[in-house]
């Protein structure tokens, strides 16, 4: 018992101690809570004082509203607020929003002053650089106007009251998203990033570069490209400014890019936003249709059911908020189920007794309207339901105007004082304020089902309703968006004269796009220009608003107007409205003869003069690397000096691949080379002897062999004569061709003209590589992107200038742009002085001798040329078409020619010259325009180089490793490299280039070979080049030189 008593005393002591500790903790908690309460009270008091200060500032600001319109007024004057430069703009905006209701405190940050919303006065040192224009983006060079962040911070921290800014402020909305660091300008940090649909301020006028100085709502300041923003309409801004008188308006509305441009954007953000429904980080783009509009009539507010009796009710309301100068409100209409029961004059009373109602059996909708000089207000903006079976939930929920990405939701509210919460697919989407009963969804997904729930939120508990009726607050509706269909067509299509006489410029206004680039749910990719149902131009850019169209295409279609369609992955839109082409633009220009220079335009003082008219289309292309470039064609048909350097940079150096496996020592490498050389020597010797005997027995071909022809000092190019071309043809006998004889060809790819092209390009390529001693690299710091030739499909490799000649198609194809050395490095003094003198001769100067060429392929520069100015400068032609050429080709490999009374450029690798001695036959051929289909062409001699001026050493090397560039090469243009196996004997020409590559030949294939994969064959081993196939087949096999013929016969 004693132990139990002691134990009880011990427990009682511990209990007392615990109670003491608990009491101390409770006192500590009480003290902390009191401290927190005092802190909150102090904060509340401070905020109240701040509110009073801001209210006074706002009142002073409103007094100057006539002089400065924050939302885009016209006349401006300096705002005389001495504390403006030092007062943070967020405080001012908070005060403005507080006066209007619930503002955008959280959306506005930073420490910029309100004075910073006024354009700064230009400083003496401000000298903006010229505009560097690019399509769709505004460019500007580095400017002294771009101040550092420290300078702007110093200005913000300045306490001086001196006014530094003047100008007017405008509210804008971003049309598209824009990241300055992805743009073309040198100082992207001076520009503001934009998000489509977000608001920003710009102040002052646009500068000469097309930029505004602006500020985002978070305080960021910088330059804004003018073509990326839309100004808010002045009339809607004026209406928005008047809403400050309404105590229940908790938002600021501005005009924006709502559906069809007729509604407004709401700056408030929803509580929850589904990322799949809206793609705007700043908040939803969905709008409340009835918020503000140009013709909104002020409506009565806060209708109240004062008393409900068995046969009557008493209702009251508050007067409308009428903007100054809007108009006069004369009276009120009280309606019951859209029937006017009484009319009350304004100012008498705002209560009404409505009798003759059967409250126990019927439900009535009571509404109050304002009657004004501009019409009556919307009855649903001041309405309530009374009577039997009234519930809190809205009724008649419906969805209209459903498209691929948008829909309009509407309902009938039980009480116009209720706000409503919108749920989309069980996710809270947005809140609609009181007196609103419509909602517009944007950025929906095409072909998707949605479930909408509208939850009514009463402003006060409707105690007059039974409990079960008070609990019914929700209404549902389901709908599905339309499948992604064709996009909307462009608007406001216009046609104007182009930058050149041979083109016109078609402009349009793109359809309204979502921030993700959708129109009607279709992913917009570009725009196409059509004439008589045929596409004549195309631009691949979703926000493009203009493009150039060749007049020759319109003349050939005899089109007098054009339409524009929006292109998308889901198809094309319908045609836009037809835009007529001015008749004066459709008249073909009269061709002018081209003046003839007195000396060779491309000849330099250090190069012996040769007869260019006897060189083929590809001859002397390597000389263009060492001479100044011929001037580009101009529409005045006059030669001009070369222009400044281009904008392209040289391609990166070729990367030397590294062999896989254990490195091979020098001794082993030489042993491998000796073994491989001896292994193939005997078979190579026998094959070579067989080829030699075969060629010796055919004497007529020995004289035309490639090496013999090149080494012959008397060799001289002469095109096939017109007599040879037309001998036995109908054109040579009579002017008309009949008899349905045709070429025995499958297509341009398989024709003899194509074979001629292929042979000559192969020979020219090998000659250039041999002569240059390997691959030539760009040099110097200035580079020019020379015009790239249209490429016939019969060529199959990359030449030394990087041009690609793809195989495997039926006609010329588009090649990728390349960079080549600039001719400006060589200077103007390398050109003949007569070249510049002749450039300024009058049209009466001596004409260049005209030559006759025949087209080897069909060629449409609009779709096949890789050059950006192809539509304006290059000529289209068909296979077999006769082309009149003036002078020699320029450094880019283009002739200046004439077809269909139009002058332009012609790629030399797609035409062949016909030597004409008979002027009468030449004129007749020009009148004919095309070679007759039954013309037998007996012989065409193609371009040949007059001789090799340099002797290039050849060496034999053996491959130490297997190499397949498609698998092992780190370079992009793997087709320029050879595939080989260990032990293959490769002939290399010249020395190693600075990238570590040889130019070599294996099995009739020529290309680049990595030097670290090869070992030179010892001199004491006799090696004959083997034509035995390698273990790997080359991608683009070339015909053996032994099979080449120096003449080509067309079989009728």
Curated annotation (Swiss-Prot):
GO cellular component, one term: synapse
In-chain residues carrying the UniProt-annotated modification Phosphoserine: 704, 712, 832, 839
GO biological process, one term: neuromuscular synaptic transmission
SUPFAM superfamilies attached to this UniProt entry: Fibronectin type III, SH3-domain
Disordered: annotated segments: 115-164, 584-615, 629-666, 697-716, 767-787, 805-829, 1029-1052
Domain Fibronectin type-III: 297-390, 393-475, 489-590
Residues covered by the SH3 domain: 167-234, 848-916, 952-1019
Domain of life: Eukaryota
Function: Plays a role in the synaptic transmission as bifunctional linker that interacts simultaneously with RIMS1, RIMS2, CACNA1D and CACNA1B.
Subunit structure: Interacts with RIMS1, RIMS2, CACNA1D and CACNA1B, and potentially with other Ca(2+) channel alpha-1 isoforms.
Domain notes: The SH3 domains mediate binding to a proline-rich motif in RIMS1, RIMS2, CACNA1D and CACNA1B.
The protein's name: RIMS-binding protein 2
Source organism per UniProt: Homo sapiens (Human)
